């Protein structure tokens, strides 16, 4: 083709045809109807809307239908096999007269087979005009229209209902057809229906979504939304842009689960809109594990200030086993009675013996396993036991003590013994008398400590007293003065000096400097007037 002044001959021919077709009607329309928009700069740019399709120039014909077909080809740019615009083509050459952008419609005899849908690019005064009928097979949503025909995003501002909102830069309103009144979602499948693969379609989607979320539309900067606030959309862009069906990656990965989250106070939060994890509990982070498995990571939650706080500070949700496991691992508060009978976590100031509240708790725990302890805990009426409470003798010969676990042993019970077994009567007068004066101190101490409660203990104590040994009532030891050493201080009530005391544990005499008070020493033991020297038959 021959280019003249930057334009091809085909472009000039198209310009003459369209000018002759629409020039008269434009003049008549403009003169007969008052336009709502007097500024011609408010209409769409023809060079950006109608990309040139040079390979269709050879198919041009002088007939009207051929010219319209050529015009349709110029209007919608280079066509693919499905009659759709291809990406990457030049759209800088002006293709149409301005008369098209001012409301002139195409002749009614043009059929959809020509690839030219009837459209109006600005809002005429009549509400019936300016409607963009679309074939359901070729219908695009508002975002795809703006990207497909090259209209800038600023002039292609669309509302959430799919209708263009008229503003200073975009007076046109592009309506949806009547047969589909519901809004179509902005999905990749709708883009793929125009002969593009999913990667190409998402290239357009990414450019549009990046402008929306970054708050930039090419003309001014506006505070936008963060892609992390919409995890499903952000993750889908990532997966579709790569072209591989990668598994779903949660954008909240690495963040703490929503349970127990603590947000900033209302006065510290920023004025911008933000979404937190606790606002969407159904979208936990990747650190969330199966509730059936306990994990140490669920023991701590991250606050917005970056400090770790215990999960007990936040709300608890039913079925949250991680919080239950955490509570069990924490130190239990209050009195704890262990299965082995030990009591832990006793508060300070509480009575710790068996007469306080601790003893009552242990007794109740023991009564749960031993029913016999219930009678001792609650008490029993002695009159219901069949005992003679008025008897001066022992009420029950075999009852040793309330705390005894078994009855009395046979040797502890006063049974009737036949006289044949009582030999002391026959031999007591034949036994030699015991002469404790002949025994040494070591044997006397042995008789004293090994015959407790017996007359031999009393006799040994008397003999030790005669040998200048004294029993200290507070120290509970036997003491005597060291031989050849006089007290360093002596008064009527006490004396101080070196003394020997008998260590029964090590069985030896130990010298020690001691302050001795006389009133703390035991007096001479009192012996009965008559007693039998046989310790096996005569008890003290």
Swiss-Prot record:
GO terms for biological process: negative regulation of intracellular estrogen receptor signaling pathway; negative regulation of transcription by RNA polymerase II; positive regulation of cytoplasmic mRNA processing body assembly; regulation of stem cell population maintenance; regulation of translation; regulatory ncRNA-mediated gene silencing; trophectodermal cell differentiation. The modification Phosphoserine is found at residues 126, 157, 165, 169, 242, 274. Pfam families: NOT2_3_5_C. GO terms for cellular component: CCR4-NOT complex; CCR4-NOT core complex; cytoplasm; cytosol; nucleoplasm; plasma membrane. It is found in: Cytoplasm; Nucleus. Residues 96-126, 276-342 are annotated as: Disordered. The keyword Nucleus applies. Its main location: cytoplasm. The modification Phosphothreonine is found at residue 93. Component of the CCR4-NOT complex; distinct complexes seem to exist that differ in the participation of probably mutually exclusive catalytic subunits. In the complex interacts directly with CNOT3. Interacts with NCOR1, NCOR2. HDAC3 and GPS2. This is CCR4-NOT transcription complex subunit 2. It comes from Mus musculus (Mouse). The gene is Cnot2.
């Amino acid at each position: 083709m021959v280019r003249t002044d930057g334009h091809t001959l085909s472009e000039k021919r198209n310009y003459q045809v369209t000018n002759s077709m629409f020039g008269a009607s434009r003049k008549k329309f403009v003169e007969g109807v008052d336009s709502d928009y007097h500024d011609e700069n408010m209409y769409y740019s023809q060079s950006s809307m109608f990309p040139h399709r040079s390979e269709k120039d050879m198919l041009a014909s002088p007939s009207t239908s051929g010219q319209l077909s050529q015009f349709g080809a110029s209007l919608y740019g280079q066509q693919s096999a499905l009659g759709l615009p291809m990406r990457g083509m030049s759209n800088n050459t002006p293709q149409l007269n301005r008369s098209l952008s001012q409301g002139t419609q195409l002749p009614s005899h043009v059929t959809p087979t020509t690839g030219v849908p009837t459209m109006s690019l600005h809002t005429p005064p009549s509400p019936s005009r300016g409607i963009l009928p679309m074939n359901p097979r070729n219908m695009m949503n508002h975002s795809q229209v703006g990207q497909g025909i090259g209209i800038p995003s600023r002039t292609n501002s669309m509302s959430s209902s799919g209708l263009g909102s008229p503003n200073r830069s975009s007076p046109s309103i592009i309506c949806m057809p009547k047969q589909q009144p519901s809004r179509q979602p902005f999905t990749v499948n709708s883009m793929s229906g125009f002969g593009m693969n999913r990667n190409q379609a998402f290239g357009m989607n990414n450019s549009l979504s990046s402008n929306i979320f970054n708050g930039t539309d090419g003309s001014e900067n506006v505070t936008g939304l963060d892609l992390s606030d919409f995890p499903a959309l952000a993750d889908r862009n990532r997966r579709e842009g790569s072209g591989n069906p990668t598994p779903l990656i949660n954008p909240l990965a690495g963040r703490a689960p929503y349970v127990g989250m603590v947000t900033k106070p209302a006065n510290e939060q920023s004025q911008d809109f933000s979404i937190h994890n606790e606002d969407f509990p159904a979208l936990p982070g990747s650190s969330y594990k199966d509730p059936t498995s306990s994990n140490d990571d669920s023991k701590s939650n991250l606050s917005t200030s970056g400090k770790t706080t215990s999960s007990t500070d936040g709300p608890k949700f039913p079925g949250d086993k991680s919080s239950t496991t955490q509570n069990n691992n924490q130190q239990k508060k209050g009195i704890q009675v262990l299965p082995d009978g030990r009591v832990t976590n006793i508060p300070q100031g509480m009575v710790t013996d068996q007469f306080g509240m601790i003893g009552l708790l242990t007794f109740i725990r023991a009564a749960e396993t031993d029913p016999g302890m219930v009678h001792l805990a609650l008490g029993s009426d002695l009159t219901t036991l069949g005992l003679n409470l008025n008897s001066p003798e022992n009420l029950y010969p075999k009852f040793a003590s309330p705390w005894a676990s078994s009855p009395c042993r046979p040797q502890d019970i006063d049974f009737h013994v036949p006289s044949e077994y009582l030999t002391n009567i026959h031999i007591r007068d034949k036994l030699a008398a015991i002469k404790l004066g002949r025994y040494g101190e070591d044997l006397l101490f042995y008789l004293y400590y090994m015959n407790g409660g017996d007359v031999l203990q009393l006799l040994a104590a008397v003999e030790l007293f005669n040998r200048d040994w004294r029993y200290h009532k507070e120290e509970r030891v036997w003491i005597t003065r060291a031989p050849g050493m006089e007290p360093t201080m002596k008064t009527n009530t006490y004396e101080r000096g070196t003394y020997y005391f008998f260590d029964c544990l090590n069985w030896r005499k130990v010298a020690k400097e001691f302050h001795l008070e006389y009133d703390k020493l035991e007096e001479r033991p009192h012996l009965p007037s008559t007693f039998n020297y046989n310790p096996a038959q005569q008890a003290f």
